[in-house]
């Protein structure tokens, strides 16, 4: 994925919501209420319906750290599934292995979680994996590779995130054994992603 270097603080201010779910960005939004480059109301312009849809798509793209191609493919899969396409879209993104590593507190951020997976630190159902985009299913189990340095890193991350992040009910985390079991697919109200998924569906539907 070709990621342009965009400061996370600027992205948070651009969208007006803390898409990275980290306390420091809540403080930033309280301190700087205007998007970057805007100083007062005089420069605000009316956003078109397409513009609103694009903003919602970008929120999700940067929240989960996926490329345009990856997000398009996730939408196509979500549309093939039964149920509400928008809910399916977010549930698929939530069940990415890098996001599970993040939600479990094994990593400080999703970017850090991608590194952990890419470096082969995570074992999925007994096999080492290095692809952050793998989608997990119910009863899948991930665990930290048997190496002291890896375990020390993850235990440190769990300690740092334990007071900042609520563990989802749809995963079962064993902090002692350093493993996570997927219980089920999350429902929409269990996904804290701050985006209007219906607008994302409308965006892609017009381009299908």
From Swiss-Prot:
Belongs to the universal ribosomal protein uS4 family. This is Small ribosomal subunit protein uS4. One of the primary rRNA binding proteins, it binds directly to 16S rRNA where it nucleates assembly of the body of the 30S subunit. Residues 95-159 form the S4 RNA-binding domain. Part of the 30S ribosomal subunit. Contacts protein S5. The interaction surface between S4 and S5 is involved in control of translational fidelity. It comes from Borrelia recurrentis (strain A1). One of its GO terms (biological process) is ribosomal small subunit biogenesis. Keywords: Ribonucleoprotein, Ribosomal protein, RNA-binding, rRNA-binding. InterPro entries: Ribosomal_uS4 (IPR022801), Ribosomal_uS4_bac-type (IPR005709), Ribosomal_uS4_CS (IPR018079), Ribosomal_uS4_N (IPR001912), S4_RNA-bd (IPR002942), S4_RNA-bd_sf (IPR036986). GO terms for molecular function: rRNA binding; structural constituent of ribosome. The lineage of its organism: Bacteria, Pseudomonadati, Spirochaetota, Spirochaetia, Spirochaetales. GO terms for cellular component: small ribosomal subunit.
């Amino acid at each position: 994925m070709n990621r342009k270097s965009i400061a996370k603080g600027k992205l948070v201010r651009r969208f007006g919501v803390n898409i990275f779910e980290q306390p420091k960005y809540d403080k930033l939004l309280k301190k700087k209420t205007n998007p970057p480059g805007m100083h007062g109301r005089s420069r605000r312009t009316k956003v078109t319906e397409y513009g609103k849809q694009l903003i919602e798509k970008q929120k999700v793209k940067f929240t989960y750290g996926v490329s345009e191609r990856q997000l398009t493919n996730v939408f196509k899969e979500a549309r093939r599934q039964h149920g509400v396409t928008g809910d399916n879209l977010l549930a698929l993104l939530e069940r990415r292995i890098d996001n599970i590593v993040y939600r479990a507190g094994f990593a400080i951020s999703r970017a850090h979680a991608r590194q952990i997976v890419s470096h082969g630190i995570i074992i999925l159902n007994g096999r080492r994996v290095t692809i952050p985009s793998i989608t997990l299913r119910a009863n899948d189990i991930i665990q930290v590779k048997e190496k002291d340095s890896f375990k020390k890193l993850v235990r440190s991350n769990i300690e740092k995130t334990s007071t900042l992040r609520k563990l989802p009910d749809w995963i079962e985390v064993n902090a002692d054994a350093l493993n996570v079991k997927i219980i089920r697919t999350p429902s929409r109200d269990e996904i804290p992603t701050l985006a209007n998924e219906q607008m994302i569906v409308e965006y892609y539907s017009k381009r299908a």
